[in-house]
């Protein structure tokens, strides 16, 4: 049996832009993608801590060092610049290995600076 387990999350991210007319996705600074292990075009969940909205989309690269978290397309109706969010990706893990699985957790601070990664 394969279990769906947390692969990685960006915790405490701040939305820096919303673009309703973009084709969709969430744009994430390449440094943050690298730190979390989330890949471009990978399916992610975004949970809006500010208002409770929860959506599923895919990640795109934003310029390295920009600290961008940009919610695009229809999802932009559920997010606003300044909202605090959690972005999570999941993976399939064989049940026998699930207890040994350890996700990557990246805690973000002001300006989407990395405070801690584990």
Swiss-Prot record:
MF terms in GO: aspartate 1-decarboxylase activity
Highest taxon listed in the record's lineage: Bacteria
Pathway(s) where this gene product acts: Cofactor biosynthesis; (R)-pantothenate biosynthesis; beta-alanine from L-aspartate: step 1/1
Cofactor note: Binds 1 pyruvoyl group covalently per subunit.
Posttranslational modification: Is synthesized initially as an inactive proenzyme, which is activated by self-cleavage at a specific serine bond to produce a beta-subunit with a hydroxyl group at its C-terminus and an alpha-subunit with a pyruvoyl group at its N-terminus.
CDD domains tied to this protein: Asp_decarbox
Cofactor section: pyruvate
Quaternary state and interactors: Heterooctamer of four alpha and four beta subunits.
Similarity field: Belongs to the PanD family.
HAMAP family: PanD
Protein name: Aspartate 1-decarboxylase
């Amino acid at each position: 049996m394969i279990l769906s387990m947390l692969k990685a999350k960006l915790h405490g991210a701040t939305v820096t832009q919303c673009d309703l007319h973009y084709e969709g996705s969430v744009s994430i600074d390449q440094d943050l993608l690298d730190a979390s292990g989330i890949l471009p075009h990978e399916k992610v969940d975004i949970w809006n801590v500010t208002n409770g909205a929860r959506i599923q989309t895919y990640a795109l690269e934003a310029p390295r060092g920009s600290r961008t978290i940009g919610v695009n397309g229809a999802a932009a109706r559920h997010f606003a610049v300044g909202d605090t969010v959690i972005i999570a990706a999941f993976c399939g893990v064989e049940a026998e290995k699930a207890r040994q699985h350890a996700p990557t957790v990246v805690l973000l601070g002001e300006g989407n600076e990395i405070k801690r990664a584990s």
